[in-house]
Amino acid sequence: MPQQLLITPATEATWVKLKEVSLWEDVTKMFGGEALLSHDANGTQQESLADGTTPGTPAAGSHDGATPGTTATGSHDEATPGTPAAGSHDGETPGIPAAGSHDGETPGTPTAGSHDGVTPGTTAAGSQESLTFKDIAVDLSQEEWGQLAPAYQDLYREVMLENYRNLVSVAGYQLSKPTVISQLEKGEGPCMAESQGPEDPILDVKNKLETKESTAEDDISVKLDHGITRGRLIEDDIVCSPLKKASSYSDTLESHRATCGKGTRRAIWTHKKKRQEGNKLENPESSNVILEQKHRKHKPARKRNKYKLDSIDHPVSCMRARRYPCNVCEKMFKQPIHLVEHMRTHTGEKPFRCKECGRAFSQSASLNTHQRIHTGEKPFACEECGKAFRHRSSLNQHHRTHTGEKPFTCDKCQKAFSQNISLVQHLRTHSGEKPFSCSECGKPFRQIRHLSEHVRIHTGEKPYKCTSCCKTFSHRAYLTHHQRIHTGERPYKCKECGKAFRQRIHLSNHRTVHTGVKAYECNRCGKAYRHDSSFKKHQRHHTGEKPYECTECGKSFSYNSSLSRHQKIHRRNTFRDDPGHENKRQL
C-alpha cells in the first residue's frame, strides 16, 4: 500500500523536502524508511532515502564535498536533486529553474547571480504561486478532436473542466477564462492549436519532439496537480492519476482505486515518451492512440467469462457507463450478471428448479414469482377494490378497469383495448389467422386458451367443479354460468322490456325479438333465423349431418332433442324388463 501511494520525480521530492520538512518526515515514516523511487531523464531509477540521506544532501563518503543546497565543484554528471548541475539546460521542471535563471528561483536555493538576497531555506517571491492553465491543460488540435470517439470526447471535456474549476477555486486563478474552457462549456470542440498562437502548448510539445530532448520536461504525462501549489497538493490531497481526481480522504481514494483496476493503483504516475511516439502524435491513426498520448490512459484489460465473451474493463470513473455486449445478438448490458442471465436465452439453460412441481426457470426472479402459485401469495393489492395479484404487471392491467384507460387501438376499426394481448388477438379477426390447431381433429383457433378448452372435449377432462352440487365442467365459463342457477343472479337485462338473463348470449338472442332482425340466412333456401343455434340446426337438413349418437344402439340424430326422445324408449324398455316391475303391477 505505501509503495503504491506516491511515485514522484526527484525534483518534486527535493522541493517537498526543502519546503515541507515535517511533511517529508511523515512521508519517510509512511514508507517505513524505504527509498522513494523516481525516474531521471534517462529512464533510470534514483534512490532518495535508501542510505538514510535526503535529497540535497550527499551520501556518506561522498568526495564531492558539496554542502546541502549547493552543486559539487566540477561535477557535471551528478548533481544533487535539489540543485541542477552547472551549465545544465536539460531536466528543468516548473518550480526548479536552471542556474542563472532570473525568472524564478529554486525553492530553498538562490539562483546564480541573484540580487534578491534570498538566503537558503527561503523562497523567492512568486515561487509558490500556482501553475498556469497551460501547465495542466491536455491540448488537442481540431483534427485530433474530430478523430476521438464520442465517449472519449466526453471524457476529455469532463477532465478539462474539472481541472479548471480546481485551479480557480483552490489556487485563486483570477485571469480571464481560456477560450478552450468557454468552448467546452458550450459543448463545442477545442480549437487550441488554431487560437493560441506561438505560445500554443501543442506546438511547444511538437518542438520538443523535433529536438528529441530526453529530460523530465519531455514527459507529456498527467500533471501532479490541478493548479494547486505542489506543497498543498501533496499535503492535503491524494491524487488518482487516470482522471487527475483529488480526494481529501484516503478511504475515498481506496474506493476509487478499486474501480480503476490493477493497472492504475498508483496515486501519481509518470510516463517517459519514446522517440518514435513523435510520429504518432503528428499523424494519429485512431482516437485511442491520440487519447493514450494526450491523457496517458491505461490499457484496458480483457476478461473472459464462462461464455467466453470479451468485456473491456474500463475504470467506472473513467467511462461513464461500462458496457458488456452479447456476442450472439449484440445486445448491451451495464452489469455482467445481466449478461449472464441474458445468455441463458440463447443456451436454453434453466438452472433454477421448483421443488414443488419440478418446473425449471432461467432466472431466480422467475422462480420466486412462480412459487407464489404454490404458496398462494398475492402481494400486489388494488387500492380501489382490494383485489390482489401475484404479479405487478397484472395489477397495472387491472388498474385500467377502474380508470377506463384503453391505450391499445386497432388501426383498422379503431376499437380500443386495455391490454396489448387483447389487441393482438383482435387483429386476428381482421386477418382471419388461426395459428392454433387441434392435433386430434385439426380444428383451428385464434387463441391458445380456446384450443386448451377444446382439447378437453377429446380428453373428457372436467377440472371445474361446482361447490354446491358437485357438478363438473370442462370450461370455467360454463361453471360461472351454472353457479348463477344457485345464486339466482341474472346480470344481463334488456333495456326494452326489462327482462333479465343469466348469460350474455341469451340477451343478444332476445334483442332480436324487439328489432325483428334475422341476421342468419341460409344460402341454399334463403330461410332466415334470429339465432345462430337455430341456423346451425337448419343447415343439417342440407348437409345430412347427425352429430348426436345414441350410446345404446348407435343410432344418430340431427338434433339433441331427437336423441333425448329416442333415449326415453330405451329407458321404458329397461323398466318393463325389470322383474320387480311385474310384482309392483300385481300389488
Curated annotation (Swiss-Prot):
Pfam family, one: zf-C2H2
UniProt keyword DNA-binding present: yes
InterPro entries: KRAB (IPR001909), KRAB_dom_sf (IPR036051), Znf_C2H2_sf (IPR036236), Znf_C2H2_type (IPR013087)
Residue ranges occupied by any KRAB domain in the UniProt entry: 76-147
Keywords tagged on the record: DNA-binding, Lipid metabolism, Metal-binding, Nucleus, Repeat, Transcription, Transcription regulation, Zinc, Zinc-finger
PANTHER family xrefs: ZINC FINGER AND BTB DOMAIN-CONTAINING (PTHR24399), ZINC FINGER PROTEIN 606 (PTHR24399:SF74)
Protein name: Zinc finger protein 69
Source organism of the structure: Mus musculus (Mouse)
